[in-house]
């Protein structure tokens, strides 16, 4: 866990609760003064539910169809009525030069929602996040979330 201040803790007892929170967050993001413009990081071990939460959030924001995990591509872009969204998965990110070569600096400088899994692998390159989710597994279905 990083040194950010925890302002809220949540318990997602099942995937339905995860989806419900994603819908609440989506509504809040769309209605903020700056529009759909934020950097959200998601920390947690493998299988903690980061991608599942992002899928629910993307669907709540209007993405239709299948939401792919960007583990191998590193980033998947989406366009919704509210604006641009980029879903990053830095799990396999090892080469800082890739940051420049792939145009990530330009993406993070542009307006839109950036959702970043495994931010620890891009430390020093990512901007300070607007929201950080620390997701941990309590049991098979239940997740403990600190923001």
Could you say what each language-model-derived stretch is?
Residues 43-45:
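P-loop (Walker A) phosphate-binding loop of NTP-binding proteins
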Residues 28-37:
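Phosphate-binding P-loop
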Residues 2-27:
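N-terminal pre-Walker A segment at the start of P-loop NTPase domains
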Residues 50:
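Conserved lysine of the Walker
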Residues 39-41:
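Short hydrophobic/aromatic beta-strand immediately N-terminal to the Walker A/P-loop
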Residues 63-78:
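Short beta-strand-centered segment that lines the nucleotide-binding/catalytic pocket of NTP-utilizing
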Residues 1-8, 59, 94-147:
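Short phosphate-coordinating micro-motif centered on Lys-Gly-acidic
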């Amino acid at each position: 866990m990083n040194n950010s201040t925890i302002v809220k803790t949540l318990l997602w007892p099942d995937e339905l609760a995860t989806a419900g929170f994603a819908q609440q967050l989506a509504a809040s993001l769309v209605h903020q003064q700056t529009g759909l413009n934020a950097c959200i990081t998601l920390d947690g071990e493998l299988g903690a539910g980061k991608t599942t939460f992002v899928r629910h959030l993307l669907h709540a924001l209007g993405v239709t169809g299948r939401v792919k995990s960007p583990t191998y591509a590193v980033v998947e872009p989406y366009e919704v009525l509210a604006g641009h969204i980029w879903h990053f998965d830095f799990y396999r990110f090892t080469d800082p030069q890739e940051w420049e070569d792939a145009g990530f600096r330009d993406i993070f400088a542009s307006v839109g929602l950036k959702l970043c899994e495994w931010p620890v692998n891009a430390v020093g390159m990512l901007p300070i996040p607007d929201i950080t989710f620390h997701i941990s597994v309590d049991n098979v279905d239940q997740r403990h979330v600190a923001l």
